[in-house]
Amino acid sequence: MRNIGDGKKTIIRSAAKRDDANEISSEKDENTTNKLTKREFGAKTFAFTSLSLFASSSSSQKEEAFADDSLNSNFWEKVDLPLEPGVILLDIAFTDENARHGFLLGTRQTILETFDGGKTWDAKDLGQDVIDDEVNYRFNSVSFNGDEGWIVGKPAILLHTVDAGKTWERVGLSPRLPGIPVLITATGDNGVAEMVTDQGAIYLTTDAARNWKAAVEETVDATLNRTVSSGVQGASYYTGSFSTVSRNPETGEYIGLSSRGNFYMSWAPGQAYWQPHNRSSARRIQSMGWRKDGGVWQLTRGGGIYLSDTKALPEEDDEFTEGKIGSRGYGLLDLGSNASGTKYFTVGGSGSVFSSEDKGKTWKRDRGTDEVAGNLYKVAFAKDDVGFILGNDGILLRYRGSA
């Protein structure tokens, strides 16, 4: 097995043996070891650990899923999925501009495929030559650029396809990779992609994962512990990880939220290190990310929502305005918008869904989703009329537009 000897900027793939990986027992607390496969790449400062694509875990998942009209919502319909109880859905992406063919990821080795815009779903079986059925993978992120796509997950695994997901190849990663891959983005054609871990490692490839370049020089905890006088509350002697990572598709900037929610960090292309920031509210941040207009949103514990005043990453911590939302104290977990950015949605605990048509200034609760018995974690739109809400216990809501 070959690893890079002294370069922290390049990662070379090589053959690697597989290590045993412990089963993931829950959404948040998963004690696993990394697992290696065909190709491995490493860097002096950062190195990727092996990642593998999730395959269907049982033959019982052959039943077709379909959309139903059980919800009394103006915007959303529930999609029944061929999944066992307890699966948490984590990401979704489509391969074509019309958003007809796509993949849905989750915990417990869940990968589903659709050919009709998400109305029906079937389990995708990748085969034992790609993944090990005995390892309970949590697939965190999927991204496509045309027919080329990527998947990452935990235990550390990376999957690559060049034929719109008909076949997948497992890419080996070094066990020295700091953290677990949580976000993958197909940023261009012909093997161009970016991968981020929960420890803040950012890697770039331009040749379909044959070589990788480290974009930052150290992990976020190393940066924070080196700059203990940064003035950011909770940053000194930090040993945690990012709970969420969000990428600005226009600028390539990243936002990473600390696991405790007491501060966040940002990175822009060309910077050697992540930059720490104080939170804008006394309440800890639950989640945050980028708006379509380039601004930033924050969701705080207790159901608060804040939007940056500028269409960019705020330079000062007080450049946020609180949105008017009657969340009744339910935690809000994600915010997203349709593809054009004209309609916003935020989701959270106990089936909570709110919509805004004035870019987040005021919000209206969708009482039709109150009967959804679960937490909603993610809002994702491929087009203005193709959108989804992902939740726990196999909950998938499909956008059907205003009634």
Predicted regions mapped to residue ranges:
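N-terminal secretory signal peptides
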Residues: 1-36
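Intrinsic disorder/low-complexity segments
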Residues: 11, 22-23, 49, 53, ...
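Residue-level hotspots at or immediately adjacent to binding/recognition sites across diverse folds
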Residues: 36-50, 61-403
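Short hydrophobic alpha-helical membrane-entry/anchor segments
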Residues: 54-58
